[in-house]
Amino acid sequence: MRILWIVAVCLIGVEGNLYQFGKMIRYKTGKSALLSYSDYGCYCGWGGQGKPKDATDRCCFVHDCCYGRVNGCDPKLTIYSYSFENGDIVCGGDDSCKRAVCECDRVAAICFGENLNTYDKKYKNYPSSQCTETEQC
């Protein structure tokens, strides 16, 4: 039963916003979102706590805060309109909630791209037990 639940969650991610966010990350960084950012520092991945470990982790912290301000839809599942144009990510559509989610993802992907030099492999698979200090959005 647990395996079916995991497969269902993965399929939702493939169809929903997490897949779109991953495409934005790849576009701005050239890296796989799943392999490079899914479990990095204290904030990159599901959930988050503590103080961001570096500028890359801070991108995830700011992204989590941005998702926390979105009202009217589930940011992790919302499918939105966007395009890649001349090196930029452009959010589209008339739905304000979908557009807000897209903007959160766009800003985070740009942040990752601007902070590629701070990415430190020692923070990959970083233990959450080391994320003890607190920081507010």
Swiss-Prot record:
Cofactor entry: Ca(2+)
Top-level taxon of origin: Eukaryota
Keyword annotations of the record: Blood coagulation cascade inhibiting toxin, Disulfide bond, Hemorrhagic toxin, Hemostasis impairing toxin, Hydrolase, Lipid degradation, Lipid metabolism, Metal-binding, Platelet aggregation inhibiting toxin, Secreted, Signal, Toxin
Tissues where this protein is expressed: Expressed by the venom gland.
Enzyme class: hydrolase
GO biological process: arachidonate secretion; lipid catabolic process; phospholipid metabolic process
GO molecular function: calcium ion binding; calcium-dependent phospholipase A2 activity; phospholipid binding; toxin activity
Record text on cofactor binding: Binds 1 Ca(2+) ion.
Compartments where found: Secreted
SMART domains named in the record: PA2c
Disulphide connectivity of cysteines: 42-131, 44-60, 59-111, 65-137, 66-104, 73-97, 91-102
Catalytic machinery residues: 63, 105
SUPFAM superfamilies attached to this UniProt entry: Phospholipase A2, PLA2 (SSF48619)
Enzyme Commission designation: 3.1.1.4
Recorded catalytic activity of this chain's protein: a 1,2-diacyl-sn-glycero-3-phosphocholine + H2O = a 1-acyl-sn-glycero-3-phosphocholine + a fatty acid + H(+)
Residues involved in Ca(2+) binding: 43, 45, 47, 64
Assigned GO CC terms: extracellular region
Classification via InterPro entries: PLipase_A2, PLipase_A2_Asp_AS, PLipase_A2_dom, PLipase_A2_dom_sf, PLipase_A2_His_AS
Signal peptide annotation: 1-16
Family that this chain belongs to: Belongs to the phospholipase A2 family. Group II subfamily. D49 sub-subfamily.
Function in brief: Snake venom phospholipase A2 that causes internal bleeding, shows very strong anticoagulant activities and inhibits ADP-induced platelet aggregation. Shows very low cytotoxicity. Is not able (or very weakly) to suppress the acetylcholine (ACh)-evoked current mediated by alpha-7-similar nAChRs in L.stagnalis neurons (IC(50)>30 uM) and to compete with alpha-bungarotoxin for binding to muscle- and alpha-7 neuronal nAChR types, as well as to AChBPs.
PANTHER family: BASIC PHOSPHOLIPASE A2 PA-11-LIKE (PTHR11716:SF101), PHOSPHOLIPASE A2 FAMILY MEMBER (PTHR11716)
The protein's name: Acidic phospholipase A2 Vur-PL2B
